């Protein structure tokens, strides 16, 4: 097996680790703007700041996963306070919906929509609530990850998705929490990176003793048992092309990625593993490989952990990581802004992995608050000179429609809930999370769904107290009705042409209630099907 040039790896790790000292005095948002502007100046870009209405909708969706109400939008847009953006950010970060939204984002990073082996429903709601509680308390990120990878209680669902497969667990843990892709070295040494099969199986060795057992209900039940044995190793047979039928391979001891092997105590003579199928709870081992990996992972000097977190949070709010893709932190994949990435990582560690602080600094920056405008030729994503445009997730889309039409006003018993469960179709067509990818492509199926969805039709039907009902019953002028419609749905005032056209549309010839209800419903339907509503910009 070829051995990669380890000095390159060592210098790479030392360079990063050496930067983790102290915190700077000036706000990080200022450093962000200075470093990003260097790129703008070099590329001769002149980005413009987003309008208040665009910023308002963007920050609500990014921090809460919802849009502002009509009353909130009207009041904030009329506010003349020069610090209103900063004050709004602080208010939204303290809103309980932010914790739920951020927990949902992290949950999707860890599991996606459809995790393997049917674990999408197992304790998923319990885990999201647990995670939301941690976010609400601003629990340090390293502590959250410690609890997740301890594998006890609600966080145990993370390991459950891999059902005791050490190799799959290694791939998932390194991708999510270290931002690295190690799966290529599962079958052969990486052709371009200094990553070998020994590295891969060394990491997998930390998870070789995880035990997963289905509980009541079998694979389709909600209960399962998760624990760790005192014995067991992964087996390595060499490269796939050299493997022979029936060959079991050699046991591989745990080894930290690009680091040393784990020093383990010797088990007592005559030690015998208990029959795990008969015990009520899987006993904890006297020495846990998994715990040793977690201790190493979250250390401040670990060059992967903090960088992966910073890069993913930056991508969440800026549309693209400083290293792109977000889960490919490697020696050959350089960041677009190396100095900024180093400073942000150093500050994140110095602030004891304070996620809320980091989010606040990112969204308060001028770089975050740019408009999605400018010449297409200047729209290179790594410059961050234009705001990213991303589709709403299914949760955001439903929350936005519900808020726009004031659905809860007519359905007080369903406050905060969807009009029925999110259907399989809605999840299929609208639900994939966005983490900096640029490959969104609307489909005919999505278009047909938005045109014919029973869920959406139910939400926009005019009822007393809803937007549709107010447009039907209100004695306000046509201009006032159109302003309410646009502020409610698009978080902005209508343009002159829109005001004229929608004013005529909302006052149909004949003027009977049925005609007004149809006009009201259709006007709302038109706006929620615009690209302006479907996307965050």
Give residue spans per PLM region.
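Bacterial N-terminal signal peptides
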Residues: 10-19
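Boundary at the C-terminal end of the N-terminal hydrophobic targeting segment
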Residues: 21-25
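Primarily short, surface-exposed interaction patches in extracytoplasmic proteins
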Residues: 26-53, 57, 67-97, 111-409, ...
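Catalytic and ligand-binding motifs that coordinate phosphates/metal ions
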Residues: 403-429
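N-terminal secretory signal peptides that target proteins for export/translocation
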Residues: 1-6
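Conserved AdoMet
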Residues: 101-104
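Adenylate-forming
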Residues: 432-434
């Amino acid at each position: 097996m070829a051995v990669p040039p380890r000095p390159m790896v060592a210098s790479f790790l030392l360079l990063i680790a050496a930067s983790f000292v102290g915190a700077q005095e000036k706000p990080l948002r200022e450093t962000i703007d200075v470093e990003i502007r260097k790129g703008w100046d070099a590329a001769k870009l002149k980005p413009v700041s987003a309008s208040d209405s665009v910023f308002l909708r963007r920050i609500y969706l990014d921090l809460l996963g919802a849009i502002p109400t009509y009353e909130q939008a009207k009041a904030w847009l009329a506010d003349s306070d020069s610090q209103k953006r900063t004050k709004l950010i602080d208010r939204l970060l303290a809103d309980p919906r932010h914790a739920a939204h951020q927990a949902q984002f992290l949950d999707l990073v860890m599991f996606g929509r459809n995790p393997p082996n049917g674990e999408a429903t197992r304790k998923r709601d319990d885990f999201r609530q647990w995670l939301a509680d941690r976010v609400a308390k601003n629990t340090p990120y390293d502590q959250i990850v410690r609890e997740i990878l301890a594998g006890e209680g609600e966080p145990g669902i993370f390991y459950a998705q891999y059902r005791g497969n050490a190799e799959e667990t290694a791939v998932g843990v390194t991708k999510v929490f270290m931002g690295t892709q190690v799966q290529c070295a599962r079958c052969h040494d990486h052709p371009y990176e200094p990553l070998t099969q020994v590295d891969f199986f060394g990491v997998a060795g930390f998870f070789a003793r995880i035990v997963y057992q289905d509980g009541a209900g079998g694979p389709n039940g909600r209960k399962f048992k998760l624990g760790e044995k005192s014995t067991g190793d992964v087996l390595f047979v060499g490269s796939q092309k050299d493997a022979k039928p029936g060959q079991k391979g050699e046991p591989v001891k745990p080894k930290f990625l690009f680091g040393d092997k784990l020093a383990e105590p010797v088990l007592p003579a005559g030690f015998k593993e208990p029959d795990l199928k008969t015990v009520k709870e899987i006993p904890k081992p006297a020495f846990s490989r998994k715990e040793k990996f977690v201790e190493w992972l979250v250390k401040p000097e670990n060059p992967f952990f903090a960088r992966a977190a910073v890069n993913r949070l930056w991508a969440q709010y800026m549309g693209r990581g400083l290293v792109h893709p977000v889960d490919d932190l490697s020696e050959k994949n350089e960041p677009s802004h190396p100095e900024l990435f180093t400073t942000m990582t150093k500050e994140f560690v110095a602030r004891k992995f304070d996620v809320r602080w980091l989010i606040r600094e990112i969204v308060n920056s001028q770089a975050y608050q740019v408009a999605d405008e400018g010449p297409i030729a200047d729209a290179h994503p790594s410059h961050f000179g234009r705001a990213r445009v991303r589709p709403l997730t299914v949760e955001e889309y439903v929350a936005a429609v519900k808020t726009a039409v004031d659905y809860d006003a007519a359905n007080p018993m369903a406050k905060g809930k969807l009009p029925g469960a999110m259907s399989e179709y809605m999840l299929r067509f609208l639900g994939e999370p966005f983490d900096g990818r640029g490959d969104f492509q609307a489909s005919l199926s999505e278009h047909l769904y938005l045109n014919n969805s029973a869920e959406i039709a139910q939400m926009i039907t005019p009822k007393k107290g809803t937007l549709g009902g107010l447009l039907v019953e209100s004695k306000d002028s046509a201009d006032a009705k159109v302003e309410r419609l646009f502020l409610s749905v698009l978080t902005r005032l209508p343009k002159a042409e829109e005001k004229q056209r929608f004013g005529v549309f909302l006052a149909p010839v004949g003027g009977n209630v049925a005609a007004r209800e149809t006009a009201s419903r259709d006007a709302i339907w038109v706006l929620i099907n615009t690209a302006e509503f479907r996307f965050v910009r």
